[in-house]
From Swiss-Prot:
Compartment(s) where it occurs, according to its Swiss-Prot or TrEMBL record: Cytoplasm
Purpose of the protein: The RuvA-RuvB-RuvC complex processes Holliday junction (HJ) DNA during genetic recombination and DNA repair, while the RuvA-RuvB complex plays an important role in the rescue of blocked DNA replication forks via replication fork reversal (RFR). RuvA specifically binds to HJ cruciform DNA, conferring on it an open structure. The RuvB hexamer acts as an ATP-dependent pump, pulling dsDNA into and through the RuvAB complex. RuvB forms 2 homohexamers on either side of HJ DNA bound by 1 or 2 RuvA tetramers; 4 subunits per hexamer contact DNA at a time.
Family statement drawn from the similarity comment of this UniProt entry: Belongs to the RuvB family.
Record's protein name: Holliday junction branch migration complex subunit RuvB
NCBIfam families in the record: PRK00080.1, ruvB
HAMAP family: DNA_HJ_migration_RuvB
Residues involved in Mg(2+) binding: T69
GO BP terms, alphabetized: DNA recombination; DNA repair
Region named Head domain (RuvB-H): 258-334
Organism (species): Serratia proteamaculans (strain 568)
Domain of life assignment: Bacteria
GO molecular function terms listed in the Swiss-Prot or TrEMBL record: ATP binding; ATP hydrolysis activity; four-way junction DNA binding; four-way junction helicase activity
Reaction(s) the record says it catalyses: ATP + H2O = ADP + phosphate + H(+)
The keyword Nucleotide-binding appears for this protein: yes
Length: 334
């Protein structure tokens, strides 16, 4: 199954992006959840503005869909500067990055998503740009080649990644601010769902918002996606009114259970329980058993299951916990 096909995938889907921009918070005062991140960023941004400096370079990491792009937008809005957006895979050559850097205005924010996927040659260009606001460019070829330095305006690099451990140490060490985004609490997600419903003009009850939030895997992007599908159900079956019962009916129809698990989550858990007697099982064997890429299991499916206590990582492989057995009404055989 392709990850983007999953309703509860935390990866963005193209047709959602315009709508997401409409409901995305613009300022820290509108930002819900991540209280430690919000408090720290308020202080760092205010201090930079008082000094008249660019904000220090910021690395944001955590599972997909938790608001890394949203936070980058908020930083630019709070600083009152432009936001330039790109991603690691797009910056194939050093010249691609150089073109973006030379077009920055003072204190602008350059946002690089999937920064762990930068090529080594592009990363080398980034080091002096981040540290000294300088761009080293090679002119000419062969023996006549020479290096010239171009001064860059002070700017803020915001890097986002789901795999902070894949960043090289020299790159990671150049970020003055590092923020980890955690899975959201249900109460915070309920607030986000209610705000999104208000932006979309939906008739959503408090219990309806709660039902959507509790099945959203701690992820705002999934919560907003589920809300849109529940809206479709309500418009056809319930005159557009989304109460708790309508939300539950819609989510049950969508095959998203009370824990927020979909077909792939249940398939993975049942594979460990049934095919590997509860584990431990290596990641490659597990990927082969469910027909999924190991990277998708490791980066997308597994983190929430581990965080919720359904899977345990051990030196010998993945194991299903007693919590997983109870979810399926099973008892672990000793």
């Amino acid at each position: 199954m392709i990850e983007a096909d999953r309703l509860i995938s935390a990866e963005p889907i193209n047709e959602e992006e315009i709508l997401d921009r409409a409901i995305r918070p613009k300022l820290l005062t509108e930002y819900v959840g991540q209280p430690h991140v919000r408090e720290q960023m308020e202080i760092f941004i205010q201090a930079a503005k008082q000094r008249g400096d660019a904000l220090d370079h910021l690395l944001i990491f955590g599972p997909p869909g938790l608001g890394k792009t949203t936070l980058a937008n908020i930083v630019a809005n709070e600083m009152g500067v432009n936001l330039r957006t790109t991603s690691g895979p797009v910056l194939e050559k050093a010249g691609d990055l150089a073109a973006m850097l030379t077009n920055l205005e003072p204190h602008d924010v350059l946002f690089i998503d999937e920064i762990h996927r930068l090529s080594p040659v592009v990363e080398e260009v980034l080091y002096p740009a981040m540290e000294d606001y300088q761009l080293d460019i090679m002119i000419g070829e062969g023996p006549a080649a020479r290096s010239i330095k171009l001064d860059l305006p002070p700017f803020t690099l915001v890097g986002a990644t789901t795999r902070a451990g894949s960043l090289t140490s020299p790159l990671r060490d150049r970020f003055g601010i590092v923020q980890r985004l955690e899975f959201y609490q249900v109460a915070d997600l309920q607030h986000i769902v209610s705000r999104s419903a208000n932006c979309l003009g939906l008739d959503l009850s408090e219990e309806g918002a709660h039902q959507v939030a509790r099945r959203a895997r701690g992820t705002p992007r999934i919560a907003n996606r589920l809300l849109r599908r529940v809206r479709d159900f309500a418009e056809v079956r319930a005159n557009g009114v989304i109460n708790g019962e309508v939300a539950m009916q819609a989510l049950d129809m969508l095959n998203v259970d009370a824990e927020g698990f979909d077909y792939m989550d249940r398939k993975l858990l049942l594979a460990i329980i049934d095919k590997f007697t509860g584990g431990p099982v290596g990641l490659d064997n597990l990927a082969a058993a469910i027909g999924e890429e190991r990277e998708t299991i490791e980066d997308v499916i597994e983190p929430f299951l581990i965080q919720q206590g359904f899977i345990q990582r051990t030196p010998r492989g993945r194991m299903a916990t007693n919590h997983a057995y109870k979810h399926f009404g099973m008892v672990r055989e000793e």
